[in-house]
Every structure is written in C-alpha cells, then in structure tokens.
C-alpha cells in the first residue's frame, strides 16, 4: 500500500488494529486508533480516538477535509 491513501483505506487499517494519521496535520505525533470495548469498558461500541500533539487521548470525528484527503498514512 502506498504511503498516502484515502480515508476509506485508513478505516480498513484502523479495523486491523493499526494507527493512522494524516500527513497534512499540523501537530506532529498525532494519530488515530480504533478502540474496541472490553468487559471493563463503559463504552459498548467501537470508537475512534486521537492522540493529540500534547499527548492527550480524545474521541475523534472526521471533518469533510479529512474524509476527502488522500494523505493518510500508517504510523
């Protein structure tokens, strides 16, 4: 798979347990990961979270720019 790919490909990689990021994001060391709930989790469905440039983990929602971008990469 090339270094830069579509958001749809990023979703496939997230489902495989990989971390993905956009080359165009301003903050470095930012990435996304798919969290799958376990028995101890308060969440009941999988969700995507982001590691921010400050090192925090937060829930993430894609913008239209993110969805249409072709600069996604595996971290």
List PLM regions with ranges.
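Short, compact, well-ordered microdomains
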Residues: 50-75
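Extended non-catalytic interaction/regulatory regions in multidomain proteins
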Residues: 1-52
